[in-house]
Amino acid sequence: MVTSTIKDVQDQLKLTEYDLLLIGDGSGTTIDQSSGWSCFYFDKNKFFYTILKGGCSFGTNNFAELAPYFNALWFDLYKQGNVLKMDRKVQIVSDSEITVKCGNKIYSRNCNLPLWSGINWLESIGYKLTWNHVNRNTNHISKLCDRIAGETRKMFLTNQTDSGMI
């Protein structure tokens, strides 16, 4: 099932050359509300895949849409032994047009600067990122990531703290 789904995404976007495929989604609203994210991580060379997810008690939707890729790249660097021995070609798939345009440097990377700074550093050590836009829920993996991101966000909603002044 997973291999046919990966092939569907490869065919949909005409992806051929890559070492790592990341398909993710985020769920958030405003900075004072919880956010969640999910990312399908596929290392083509090792034929290893997993779903990464996370969230926090704050975060805008744009923050949540970017978080899966920063975290997946950080995870990948750890899996590589914290050192890249050669360039690593990464295909990133997102339904966030803003995230993709910032990733491809059509828009500036000034919003969510801490995450973009980390991504910039990862690019400087050899990650070659290609950002691809897909419409929302147009493949099974994106649908799965959308659902997991929303569920993860809800986990943090129940733990929301009072942000009032003391």
Which residues fall in each region the model found?
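Short C-terminal domain-edge/linker segments immediately following a structured domain
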Residues: 51-55, 121-126, 161-165
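RNase H catalytic domain
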Residues: 27-31, 70-146, 153-155
